[in-house]
C-alpha cells in the first residue's frame, strides 16, 4: 500500500493539463498608497469554492462557467461582487464600509468551505457554521460537522473528547492561531478552555500537516482562529442557560486606540450548581462546575512600515466537582464516606505573533511566534490523587520568500520548545524536562493553474526523543473544472503523557500498570507513525442548484505506539510499547447540496477500520464505531425587514453504529457488559430569531430524542469496590438538554 501511494505521488505530475483561472490582487488605500490586503475572502457566490488572499494580497481561483459572480469580502470593508465572464487578471481595491444606505449586491457565504486551490485538505468552519449550535467551547464546536467525532470520555467528569481519523486528540495538533495550545497537561480538559464566542473560524486539516508547525501531528491539525480587536464588534454579550443547570456569560469589549493599535477584553464565565441524577445510579449526571476565563488581546498594524503584531494575555480558573449525589467535599474528600472528585485548574498564557512584510519585495516576509504557559491542576478521583504542573515555552521563527519567481516559494525557520512536567500520581512524584531545537524548510511549487506541491523537511534534536527527521509532502491537482485531487504523506513523532492523557481511568478502580520498556518517559519509547492520504472533491449543478461531493481515504501506520490496554484485565489499565501492527484506516464521503435558496443539506458517511496488536491478539479499537452517518439541514428565511431580521433553523442527526466494549467477562455476572453496544441515533436542533444585525435570540435542544446509554457507570452501587468503572462510554450519558440564549453586539 505504501509503495503504491508513493508511486502515485511520483507519477501524478505527468497527468497535468491546463485549466483556466481568475487571479488578481486585493488592495486597500492607505494614505494614497495601494497596500495589499492579507486574509480577504474571495469566492464564487452560492458555492463552497473560495480562497483567501496571501501576504501579498494575491489570489488565484478556478474560473467558473456556471457562476460568474465573484465575491470579495473583508471585515470592515464594503463587500464587492464582480461579474466575471472569462478568465482574467484583476485588481480589486476595497472601500471602507462607511455608508449603511449604500446599495450593495450581496451573496451568502457557505458555513463550511473547502478550497480547490489549497494543497492540504482543509475544512474551514466559519462563524455561520459555529452559530448553528450553542458551541459553548471548542469541544462542542464540531457537532454539525463529520470531520471530527465527539463523545464523553467518562460518565463522571462530563468531559468531551474528540477523534479524527479514528484517533483521539493527543494525536491531533491543536493550535490557537497556529501556536500549540491543547497539549501536555491540558490534553484531558483543554478543549473546554476556549469559549465558543471567541472563535472567528476553525480550520481542520486531515493527515500530515506542515513541518512549519512542528513534528507532533499524526492524525491532523485543528487550528482555532480567534476574533481580532480591530474587526470584532466594539461590544458583544452572549447569555446562555440550559435546563441541566449550566449558565454562561460572554462579554467582549474592543477599542481602537489609534490608527495602529487596537485592544480587546474577552471575558467568559460559566457555572453549574444543580445536582441532578435522572438515571438514578446515585451519581451526579453532570458535574458541578465554574470557570472564569479572561483574555486581553492587543493588535498592532502599520501598513506603511509592514509590521503587524498580536499580544495575548490570558488567565483561567476552572473548577469541577463530581461524584455521588451525597458527596460533600468538606467532609468526604479522599475518604470512603462517599465517592467524589474535584478538579481545580489554574492556567496562565502569554503569547506574541509578530510579522514583517518587506515594502519593496511583497513576496518576502518573516514572522516570529512565541508563547509561555503555566498549567497547574490539582485533582482527586475517589481515593486517588493526580496533580500536574506543566510549564511550556514555545518559539517559531519563519522566513518566507521565493526562488527566482512567485511560482517557486519557500518557508524556512527555526523552532524551540521547552516543557517541564511535575506530576503527583496517587502516591508518587514524577518530574521530567523536555526541550527541542529544530530547523525546517518547506518548498512550494504552484504552476498558477492546476497543479501545486508542498515538500517539507524538518530536523530536530530532542533531549529525550533524540535526533530525527520529519518529512512531509502534499500534492494538489485539478483535473477539470470544479474538481480537486489531493494526496499527502508525512511522519509524526511524540512523547506520550500517559497519565494526563488518560485521566478518565482514575475515575475507576483499575490499577495503572506501566511496563518498563527501557524508554525515557515512564519507561516507554516515543510514539511514531506515518500518515498517508488522498481525497477528491467535485462540485456539480443539478436542477439548477449547486453542490459538491467529496471522498477521502487516510491510513495511519504506527511504527511505535503506547498501547492503552483495558482488555487484558477489567481491573487494570496497562501501558506498553506496540509489539506488532497498529493501523487506523478512515474513509469519509460527503455531499453538500443547496436544495433551495437559503436551504442547505449536508450528508456524510464515515467508515473506520482501526486495529492494534494487544497482549490478547489483534483487536479492533474499543468504543469506536466502524460506521457513522451525519445529516445536517439548515434553512434561513429571507430578510424580514431592512434591519436584517430573519429566522434560522438548523438540525443535525447522527447515527452511530455498534462499538466494541472492552471485555468484562471475568467480572461477576451483575458487573458484566455485552461485547458490543447497540447502534443509536442522536438529534440536535436549534432555532434562531434574528431581530437585527445587532440582536438575536436562540432556542435549541441537544439529544432531543433522549437516547441514554444503559449502565454508564459499572458498579455504581459499590464505587470503592473492584469493579467500579465510569469509562465504558459509547454514547450520550445525559438525556435531552434544552437551552436558550441571546446575542447582542454594538459596532
What residue ranges belong to the model's regions?
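Short acidic/polar hinge/loop motifs at secondary-structure boundaries
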Residues: 59-62, 179-206, 294
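Flexible loop and strand-edge segments within Gram-negative outer membrane beta-barrel domains
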Residues: 272-293, 299-364, 372-390
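C-terminal beta-signal and adjacent terminal beta-strands/loops
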Residues: 493, 655-664, 688-747
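Gram-negative outer-membrane beta-barrel transporters
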Residues: 449, 550-558, 575-662
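Short, acidic, small-residue-rich periplasmic hinge/interaction motif at the N-terminus
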Residues: 27-33, 38-45, 71-77, 87-131, ...
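N-terminal periplasmic accessory domains that precede
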Residues: 87-93, 138-141, 160-163, 175, ...
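Membrane-embedded beta-barrel scaffold of Gram-negative outer-membrane proteins
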Residues: 365-379, 478, 486, 522-577, ...
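Extracytoplasmic beta-strand/coil segments of soluble accessory domains associated
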Residues: 139-180
Amino acid at each position: 500500500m505504501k509503495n503504491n501511494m508513493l508511486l502515485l505521488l511520483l507519477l501524478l505530475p505527468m497527468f497535468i493539463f491546463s485549466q483556466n483561472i481568475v487571479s488578481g490582487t486585493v488592495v486597500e488605500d492607505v494614505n494614497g498608497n495601494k497596500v495589499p490586503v492579507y486574509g480577504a475572502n474571495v469566492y464564487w457566490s452560492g458555492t463552497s469554492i473560495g480562497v483567501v488572499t496571501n501576504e501579498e494580497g494575491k489570489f488565484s481561483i478556478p474560473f467558473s462557467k456556471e457562476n460568474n459572480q465573484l465575491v470579495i469580502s473583508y471585515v470592515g470593508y464594503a463587500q464587492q461582487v464582480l461579474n466575471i465572464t472569462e478568465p482574467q487578471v484583476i485588481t480589486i481595491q476595497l472601500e471602507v464600509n462607511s455608508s449603511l444606505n449604500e446599495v450593495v449586491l450581496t451573496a451568502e457565504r457557505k458555513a463550511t468551505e473547502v478550497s480547490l486551490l489549497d494543497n492540504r485538505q482543509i475544512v474551514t468552519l466559519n462563524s455561520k457554521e459555529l452559530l448553528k449550535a450553542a458551541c459553548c467551547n471548542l469541544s462542542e464546536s464540531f457537532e454539525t460537522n463529520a470531520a471530527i467525532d465527539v463523545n464523553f470520555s467518562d460518565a463522571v467528569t462530563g468531559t468531551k473528547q474528540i477523534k479524527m481519523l479514528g484517533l483521539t486528540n493527543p494525536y491531533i495538533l491543536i493550535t490557537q492561531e497556529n501556536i500549540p495550545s491543547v497539549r501536555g497537561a491540558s490534553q484531558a480538559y483543554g478543549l473546554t478552555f476556549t469559549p465558543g464566542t471567541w472563535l472567528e473560524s476553525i480550520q481542520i486539516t486531515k493527515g500530515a500537516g506542515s513541518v512549519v508547525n512542528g513534528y507532533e501531528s499524526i492524525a491532523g491539525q485543528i487550528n482555532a482562529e480567534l476574533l481580532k480587536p480591530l474587526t470584532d464588534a466594539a461590544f458583544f454579550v452572549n447569555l446562555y442557560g440550559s435546563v441541566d443547570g449550566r449558565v454562561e456569560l460572554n462579554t467582549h469589549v474592543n477599542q481602537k486606540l489609534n490608527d495602529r493599535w487596537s485592544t480587546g477584553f474577552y471575558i467568559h464565565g460559566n457555572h453549574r450548581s444543580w445536582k441532578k441524577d435522572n438515571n438514578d445510579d446515585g451519581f451526579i449526571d453532570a458535574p458541578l462546575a465554574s470557570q472564569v476565563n479572561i483574555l486581553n488581546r492587543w493588535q498592532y498594524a502599520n501598513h506603511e512600515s509592514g509590521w503587524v503584531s498580536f499580544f495575548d494575555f490570558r488567565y483561567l480558573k476552572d473548577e469541577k466537582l463530581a461524584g455521588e449525589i451525597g458527596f460533600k467535599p468538606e467532609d468526604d474528600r479522599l475518604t470512603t464516606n462517599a465517592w467524589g472528585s474535584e478538579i481545580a485548574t489554574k492556567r496562565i498564557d502569554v503569547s506574541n505573533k509578530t510579522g514583517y512584510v518587506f515594502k519593496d519585495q511583497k513576496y518576502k516576509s518573516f514572522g516570529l511566534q512565541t508563547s509561555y504557559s503555566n498549567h497547574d491542576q490539582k485533582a482527586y478521583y475517589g481515593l486517588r490523587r493526580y496533580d500536574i504542573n506543566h510549564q511550556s515555552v514555545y518559539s517559531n521563527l519563519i522566513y518566507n520568500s521565493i526562488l527566482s519567481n512567485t511560482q517557486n516559494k519557500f518557508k524556512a525557520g527555526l523552532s524551540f520548545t521547552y516543557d517541564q512536567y511535575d506530576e503527583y500520581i496517587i502516591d508518587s512524584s514524577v518530574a521530567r524536562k523536555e526541550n527541542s531545537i529544530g530547523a525546517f524548510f518547506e518548498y512550494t511549487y504552484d504552476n498558477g493553474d492546476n497543479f501545486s506541491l508542498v515538500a517539507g523537511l524538518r530536523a530536530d534534536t530532542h533531549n529525550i526523543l533524540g535526533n530525527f527527521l520529519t518529512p512531509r509532502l502534499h500534492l494538489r491537482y485539478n483535473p477539470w473544472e470544479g474538481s480537486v485531487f489531493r494526496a499527502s504523506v508525512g511522519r509524526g513523532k511524540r512523547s506520550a503523557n500517559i497519565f494526563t492523557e488518560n485521566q478518565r481511568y482514575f475515575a475507576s478502580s483499575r490499577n495503572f500498570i506501566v511496563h518498563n520498556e527501557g524508554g525515557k518517559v515512564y519507561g516507554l519509547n516515543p510514539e511514531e507513525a506515518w500518515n498517508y492520504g488522498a481525497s477528491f472533491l467535485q462540485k456539480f449543478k443539478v436542477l439548477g442548484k449547486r453542490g459538491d461531493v467529496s471522498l477521502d481515504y487516510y491510513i495511519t501506520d504506527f511504527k511505535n505506539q503506547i498501547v492503552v490496554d483495558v482488555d487484558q484485565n477489567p481491573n487494570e489499565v496497562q501501558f506498553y510499547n506496540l509489539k506488532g501492527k497498529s493501523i487506523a484506516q478512515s474513509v469519509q464521503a460527503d455531499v453538500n447540496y443547496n436544495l433551495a435558496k437559503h436551504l442547505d443539506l449536508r450528508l456524510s458517511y464515515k467508515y473506520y477500520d482501526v486495529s492494534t496488536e494487544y497482549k490478547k491478539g489483534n483487536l479492533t479499537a474499543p468504543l469506536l464505531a466502524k460506521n457513522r452517518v451525519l445529516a445536517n439541514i439548515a434553512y434561513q428565511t429571507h430578510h424580514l425587514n431592512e434591519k436584517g431580521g430573519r429566522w434560522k433553523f438548523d438540525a443535525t442527526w447522527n447515527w452511530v453504529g455498534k462499538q466494541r466494549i472492552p471485555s468484562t467477562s471475568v467480572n461477576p455476572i451483575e458487573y458484566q457488559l455485552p461485547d458490543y453496544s447497540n447502534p443509536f441515533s442522536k438529534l440536535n436542533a436549534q432555532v434562531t430569531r434574528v431581530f437585527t444585525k445587532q440582536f438575536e435570540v436562540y432556542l435549541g435542544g441537544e439529544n432531543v430524542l433522549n437516547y441514554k446509554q444503559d449502565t454508564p457507570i459499572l458498579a455504581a452501587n459499590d464505587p470503592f469496590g473492584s469493579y467500579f468503572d465510569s469509562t465504558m462510554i459509547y454514547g450520550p450519558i445525559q438525556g435531552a438538554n434544552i437551552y436558550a440564549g441571546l446575542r447582542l453586539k454594538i459596532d
